[in-house]
Design a protein with these regions (language model features):
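Glycan-recognition and catalytic cores of secretory/periplasmic carbohydrate-active enzymes
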Residues: 1-242
Length: 242
């Protein structure tokens, strides 16, 4: 197949081997293990997964599918579809955030220009659509939800992207790096505002994330991975020179 199987329980439902965009985040463990005494083949698996995902998991404009399905016998690509997004062809914000973070991370480990170029492509689409569809620097859960700016927000996607941009700005050339850093800082400012801070409302840091909108689950909620990437982004920004 060239990718890691994500959901064995859905092989029959989806009609093949399935890989979700979230899996890009897991490749860091393979790279780290290969670099720290593990089997070097783990690195090959990670690179092959990133290559295959780059080839089949994205539309021409750089927008991603949540799920890619492959034939279980010969491995050919069958279809791209959504699971947690609005539609198969829509721009689900958190899925795109996994792609941005994932390819920035793959470039960190490989230093292969093709991965940096692709990270910037998927990032630039996200930033463009964000400005078209949101009233601030935190996206609506899916940028093609017909409710537009009235759709639920997803702070978790903003946290993932902010952290990724603070890494990506180191690798991007000149003006683009400055654009990425400024965007990340604006995201963190919004996330740190009264609109998104939980304060004494619950034990989380952040409000207004969306987990699985189609299933009616975790809509306008506090989600632990939003807090995780929010803290990671803040730490990355603090480590930079002013």
């Amino acid at each position: 197949m060239g990718t890691i199987l994500s959901w064995p329980r859905h092989v029959k439902d989806y009609g093949g081997h399935n890989t979700i965009m979230d899996n890009m985040m897991n490749l860091e463990l393979l790279f780290w293990a290969a670099d720290n005494g593990g089997n070097s083949h783990l690195r090959d698996i990670a690179i092959k997964h990133a290559e295959t995902t780059m080839k089949h998991h994205f539309r021409e404009d750089g927008g991603c599918y949540h799920v890619a399905v492959y034939d279980t016998l010969d491995g050919h690509f069958i279809k791209g579809m959504t699971h947690q997004g609005y539609a198969d062809s829509s721009l689900w914000a958190r899925g795109q955030s996994w792609a941005i973070y994932g390819y920035a991370m793959v470039y960190r480990y490989t230093k292969e220009q093709r991965f940096l170029n692709f990270a910037q492509k998927v990032t630039d689409l996200y930033l463009k659509r964000l400005q078209e569809t949101s009233d601030d620097w935190v996206p609506i859960w899916d940028m093609d939800d017909p409710r537009g700016k009235d759709a639920p927000k997803d702070a978790s996607a903003a946290c993932v992207v902010a952290s990724a941009l603070l890494e990506l700005q180191q690798y991007a050339d000149g003006e683009k790096g400055k654009i990425y850093q400024k965007a990340a800082e604006q995201m963190l400012r919004d996330l740190s505002s009264d609109r998104y801070q939980s304060r004494d409302k619950n034990v989380a840091f952040l409000l207004h994330s969306t987990g699985h909108h189609p299933a009616g689950s975790e809509i306008d909620a506090s989600i632990i991975y939003a807090d995780y990437y929010y803290i990671e982004a803040l730490l990355r920004r603090r480590s930079m020179t002013p």
